[in-house]
């Protein structure tokens, strides 16, 4: 990779933080702000003691971050994993959430210690070509996530209206709801955080209700959760496992969390305050992901119980003999396994457990789609500002992301079938998994650099764990790329996929190389990359 070889000179302004040389002229900040400029004060407490008041003050960024673990992409991944593998992949969900927590801990620590988010650090350390490719891939991840939110919301509106709102109509409605969130943002950060906590509570109630009425077999569920095995599994189950990892650990969410923690007033000149902030953010993130894990577990268990090895004919018979018999026609009368999606999932729940289950499912799906809208906007804003130093108003950023997401979703909704919309959602989950190294590798790199993180750099044990994460993510994606090539519909696609694969592997190799340098591999140090080992020039 080539690009800028001389890193910009930086100066240390406070404990563990760095700042760029100021640009000439006043900063250009559009009206309406582009950043979480409101700072939440942290109450005083006796040093060395745990304070619930302090935990409450630090509570917010972790729950906003956890929304990415509950977006429609996750719900789709959960229900399909349950339908394809029953309870066999519950352990993948558990350990993917644990790995997600480790990554989010590193993201929060980077933001607290340096006072900068991951995008800003990437801008300072990576040469122009790699950081531009990184930025483009993160924008792709954000647009892909927003497309999933559009798809989930459109299907939710269709279910709630008993089909009166067509899918394309639901897609267009998502344009309107964005203005509501921009309006809500004017009421302050704490109220915004409270609203998203309310949406998480709705999801916990709705999907928890489905879990109670479905009554999954608890013994089989616990075995699937704590015994890592998958007897009789093939490529469909493997692809679902990859989809779970990609849906749970969202690449842009790591960039988002490193920025959200900057909304709390932390005195970065005092190591005690930094250590305390790291502790409280870790506790909050653990609680938030604990909640998100159980919500995902509810969905996967419900569909593992209701859909596993279910045939289309069986689903047709169930609906034909229920009060929702008009929906039976969506299931072909054959003995193939049901290809479950958002829509069919809601219908079969309604046929099995009554119309209330259908509408409660749709409300939960709607909450999942709506809650992810604003966090995706923030992520896009932080990524753009960090990588490009380009500041847009939140309205402009939201309009750009939603426009890019709506157009392909609208075309599929108008000209294709519902199944095509759900297939697009599956593809987007795999895309998130493929893009994951472009968030995981940078965060592992920078949190391992003593020159940047000082005494808060990852220790030997953490480096072993995080390096294992890096190898696992890269191995999963390499296996997927190799497995995917034979399934291409036409040989003409091979050239395009091969070109993209070369770029993908080239960027991944570069990121692994710089990560190894940051971990102390001095033999790999090139003169233009010494700052990954020794830090930026003072």
Curated annotation (Swiss-Prot):
The chain crosses the membrane at residues 55-75, 82-102, 140-160, 165-185, 194-214, 241-261, 287-307, 347-367, 395-415, 433-453, 469-489, 493-513. Glycans are attached at residues 321, 335. Signal peptide: none annotated. InterPro entries: NRAMP_fam. GO terms for biological process: iron ion transmembrane transport; iron ion transport; manganese ion transport; MAPK cascade; response to lipopolysaccharide. Its main location: membrane. It catalyses: Zn(2+)(in) + H(+)(out) = Zn(2+)(out) + H(+)(in); Fe(2+)(in) + H(+)(out) = Fe(2+)(out) + H(+)(in); Mn(2+)(in) + H(+)(out) = Mn(2+)(out) + H(+)(in). Residues 1-36 are annotated as: Disordered. Keywords: Endosome, Glycoprotein, Ion transport, Iron, Iron transport, Lysosome, Membrane, Transmembrane, Transmembrane helix, Transport. GO terms for cellular component: endosome membrane; late endosome membrane; lysosomal membrane; phagocytic vesicle membrane; plasma membrane. It is found in: Late endosome membrane; Lysosome membrane. Residues 76-81, 161-164, 215-240, 308-346, 416-432, 490-492 are extracellular. Macrophage-specific antiporter that fluxes metal ions in either direction against a proton gradient. Localized to late endosomal lysosomal membranes, delivers bivalent cations from the cytosol into these acidic compartments where they may directly affect antimicrobial activity. Involved in iron metabolism and host natural resistance to infection with intracellular parasites. Belongs to the NRAMP family. This is Natural resistance-associated macrophage protein 1. It comes from Sus scrofa. The gene is SLC11A1.
